[in-house]
Amino acid sequence: MSDRGDDVACAWAPSPCQTGRQACLRLLATLIDHAGGDARGLAVFLLDHGDAPSDVRPPARPALDQATVIEVSRRLRAVAPAWNRLLRGDHGEFVVIAQGLVDGGTVLGTAARLVHAFDEALQGAETCVDAEVSVGIAFAPQHDARAEALLAAAEASLREASIRARRGRRKRRPAAPPSDSAA
C-alpha cells in the first residue's frame, strides 16, 4: 500500500490512502468517536460486481482494469456528498462510508444511486464488464453502532445480495437448445 495516497480508487480517503477491512474499521471507529459514540446516521455501503467473497474463496468476478476502477471511483464520488469516504476493501469491493443519513429511505435511495453509478461505469468501460452490481448496507441505529458490527452487517448484506443476484441470473438464462443426439 502506498503512503502517497495515489491509489485513485480510494483517493477520497481523508489521509494517506489505505485500503482493506482494517482501514475501514479504523475510519468507522474514528467517525463514531468524533460523534461522541453516537453513530446515528452513519451508513456503510459495500459495492461489488460478480459473486461476493466468502471466508474460503476469493470472489468470482471479472477483473477491472485501472481505467474502469478510476471511472467507478469518479462516479461513486459524484453520487455521495463530499463528507463521505470511499475506500477499497480487501477483495476489491468499493466501500462508501456515509454520514448524516436521516432514515432508511435516504439510505436505500443512496444505495440505488451508488449501484446505478457503478453499473454505468461498468457498461461504459472499454473492456465491457458483464456483471451484476450488488450492494450490502448497514445503517446505525438499525444495526449495532460499533465499527466492527457495522462492517460485519454490511458484509453479510453484500453476501445475501450477491446470492440473490446469482439466483436471478440463473432464472434469466435461456434454456439450452435441444441436443441433436436426442433425435
List each model region and its residues.
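Hydrophobic pocket-lining residues within nucleotide cofactor-binding pockets
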Residues: 49-52, 101, 140
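A short glycine-enriched loop-to-beta-strand structural element that forms part of the catalytic core
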Residues: 93-99, 123-157
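Residues at or immediately flanking beta-strands
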Residues: 39-41, 85-86, 128-136, 168
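Conserved long alpha-helical elements within nucleotide-processing catalytic cores of c-di-GMP signaling
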Residues: 9-29, 36-44, 50-77, 87-91, ...
